[in-house]
Amino acid sequence: MLIRLKKRKILQVIVSAVVLILFFCSVHNDVSSSWLYGKKLRLPVLTRSNLKNNFYTTLVQAIVENKPADSSPDLSKLHGAEGCSFANNVAAHDSGHDSDLSYESLSKCYNLNKTVQESLREVHSKFTDTLSGKLNFSIPQREALFSGSEGIVTIGGGKYSVLAYTMIKKLRDTGTTLPIEVIIPPQDEGEDDFCKNWLPKFNGKCIYFSDIVPSKPLSDLKLTHFQLKVFGLIISSFKRIIFLDADNYAVKNLDLAFNTTSFNDTGLILWPDFWRRVTPPAFYNIIGSSINIGKRVRFVSDDISPVSRYDPFVSNSNDYTPKERQEHFLKHVPLHDLDGTMPDLSSESGQMVIDKIRHFNTLLLALYYNVYGPTWYYKMISQGTAGEGDKDTFVAAAHALNMPYYQVRTNFEFDGFFYQKDDYKGLALLQHDFEQDYKQYQKAQQKVKANIEEFSKLDPDYTLDNGFLKTLMVNDDGSDLDIMFIHASFYKADPWTLYHENRFIGPNGEQVRGFRKPHRYGMDFELFLFNDMRGSFCTTPKSQVIKFKYFTDKVNTPEWDAMCEYLTNHVNYLESTHKEAMGEKN
């Protein structure tokens, strides 16, 4: 009898275990076996059917509940404080501004009182606690949120759908076959012809906010402008994404981007902007990140060379008293050369490569910074400098959460032309191949390590260019790394605006070439753009032109015909100068 009871209990335990496993599998029947490598095997709190609704509701609730009090003080008043010598828009190559970018200077130029800082720190901490609490989704739950595998994401709507159209054609022209999702913001829904008839032919589709996010959370946030980008990255169906602004054109095949060492090592690839960082110490205090004031670890983007190579207070430390060294680090070393800070340069978010599973929380915290960007974080992180907006919120979020990322070390190149003497028109940022950059960075590390004695000597002539960018971060033959993206953010490929603003026309009415570096990206990019715009909107019968909402009231007007004449004239000019532009001999 006792043996039978024991057998019955054992059988009950086995049956219960089987039922439990079947329940777990039923909830996750569309999730890969990647749950096996999760740190903890947790039964899901949310069933698959309501996972997304609960996620977005919980996320928005956490953002709303942790709204910072009041709003940021006026920057002009902060910058007018005694002892503030704020240097606006310090470029990568600018020298003589180390003291302006120092811990002491940036502290004085963005000096929040302790009560305000503590209030900001409290709500920031509560939100990050939610990331490790209610929003601490397991690997399988994260994967269930995003049904797609990997692809390219951009933001459309309005004129940005027109820009995305040309950008996508350039992607396919380079041989990139990855699927594409165009995120359509709530106020721009209705791009039916573009979304339903044209985009599927190019292995793409539109994603509408209203199809993904419940209406109440969406209305609670009232997203605009930069905020739409980060939320768009979250609602995309892909687990791994290459994000491109709609005016950013890939000139290399991107199909293998997710198989690169740099991406697998970090899960987040970023590119540099033109400007030095001016994020104040107050931000680091708010996010709970410690700055080691006595430890310098880099010279702008050079974190390979020993500090003794460029800082005499380190190479000849015995020549200075502890007080002199402390004053040096506080007053004369750029804050973002110190240990515990985000590295220079500031970031440019027109292109990013992101593992959304690995950097799930990074994106959620970046969304928090963007929702409260206009009232607090944009001004705090960038202090009103050029390009203020979402661009530095991604690196800030990764830094706050101590997550890995790689920012391309090679500075971008400009492309543009002189409209008149001393009147340079910058048209595009040329960003470099991230994997080439990463591999060269690793080679440079090995070179410095193998010659550490030589590199440790103080070099009085050291500059970022001659000590790092033009020596360690170039190919073995001395040539520059490849260009991967043309971010044409100044004269956007919107034919209507180009025509009305008389772009690519000189001061005397003559045709001019704007893009002057085809040798760097291996093609006549300007001819591609204008040929495509003319072919898509002018040589095609008007009845067959894609019915973009942006063009609704423009197509059947005399000005449309004038626009087409403008495009044709410029195409003719570009074709006549093509060989010369490409350096070809007749």
Swiss-Prot record:
Source taxonomy: Eukaryota, Fungi, Dikarya, Ascomycota, Saccharomycotina
Organism: Saccharomyces cerevisiae (strain ATCC 204508 / S288c) (Baker's yeast)
GO CC terms of this entry: Golgi apparatus
Oligomeric form and interacting partners: Interacts with SVP26.
Gene: MNN5
UniProt pathway: Protein modification; protein glycosylation
InterPro entries assigned: Alpha_mannosyltransferase (IPR022751), Nucleotide-diphossugar_trans (IPR029044)
Name of the protein: Alpha-1,2-mannosyltransferase MNN5
EC class (word): transferase
Entry-linked SUPFAM superfamilies: Nucleotide-diphospho-sugar transferases (SSF53448)
Keywords tagged on the record: Glycoprotein, Glycosyltransferase, Golgi apparatus, Signal, Transferase
Glycan-linked positions: N113, N136, N259, N264
EC number, UniProt record: 2.4.1.-
Function: Responsible for addition of first and second mannose residues to the outer chain of core N-linked polysaccharides and to O-linked mannotriose. Implicated in late Golgi modifications.
GO biological process: mannan biosynthetic process; protein glycosylation; protein mannosylation
